[in-house]
C-alpha cells in the first residue's frame, strides 16, 4: 500500500522511483558488512545512508525540476516515516510515498514492487536499493531517460549483480534470476531478452555490502564527503576513515 503526503500531487510524468530500505536495526540490516565491523556499527552507518538519500531525493529544493515521484519501499512493517525521522532525515519538501515490501525473498519483493508501479498507473518504475549513499540524481535521471527508448533498464554493481532495475509497464523479468550472486545481472538481461524486451544499461553503481566496499566509498567521497555528508561524518565518527582522510576532515 502506498501513501503520499499530498495525494493530489502524484504522478509526475508517469514516473516512479522506489527506494528499497530496511529499518536500521543492528543485525537486521547490512549484515555482511556488520560481520566485519560489528552489527551496531554497520547499522549506524546505514542510518547515515538513509539520511543522505532522503536529503538528495526528498528534501532537496531542486525537486521542482524532477520528473518522477519518490516512494520508500520498506521492510519490516513499521511506521517507516517515523523511522526516517528517528534517523534524523530532513523533512521532505515534496510528496513522498511509502510502500511495504511483500514477498518471500528479494527477487519476489522486487517483482511485486515493480508490478505495483504498473498497477497504480505509472508508465515507468525504477527501483534502487539504499546501499549506495552516493547514488546521484543523474544516475536516476539516466535510468528514466533510458526507459524512453528501452523496455528495461539496469545499472550493474561491481560484483555481478545490479544496483538499479526499472521497466516500462510490467514484465516478468525476475523469474529464475539468482539473487545475490555474481550472475544476477547477466541472468536478468538474458531473461528480459528472451521475452523480446529491449534492455538498456546505465553506468555501474557500486553497493556497500562488504568491508572492502568501504574503500571504494571513501575514495568516491574524498576529499570532503560533500557528495554524502552524513555518510562521511558517520565514517569519521565510527572510526572507519583512514588516518589521511581523518586529517583532511579535521583540517
Which ranges hold each PLM region?
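Short, glycine-/small-residue-rich phosphate/pyrophosphate-handling segment
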Residues: 171-191
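A short, N-terminal amphipathic alpha-helix
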Residues: 46-65
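Short phosphate-binding loop-to-helix
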Residues: 82-124
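Short beta-strand/loop segment that forms part of the nucleotide-sugar
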Residues: 66-76
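Conserved donor-nucleotide/metal-binding helix-loop-beta segment in metal-dependent transferases, i.e.
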Residues: 133-159
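N-terminal nucleotide-binding beta1-loop-alpha1 segment
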Residues: 1-33
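Conserved alpha/beta core of the MobA/IspD/sugar-nucleotide pyrophosphorylase nucleotidyltransferase superfamily
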Residues: 190-251
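Short aromatic-hydrophobic micro-motifs that form the base-stacking/packing surface
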Residues: 126-128
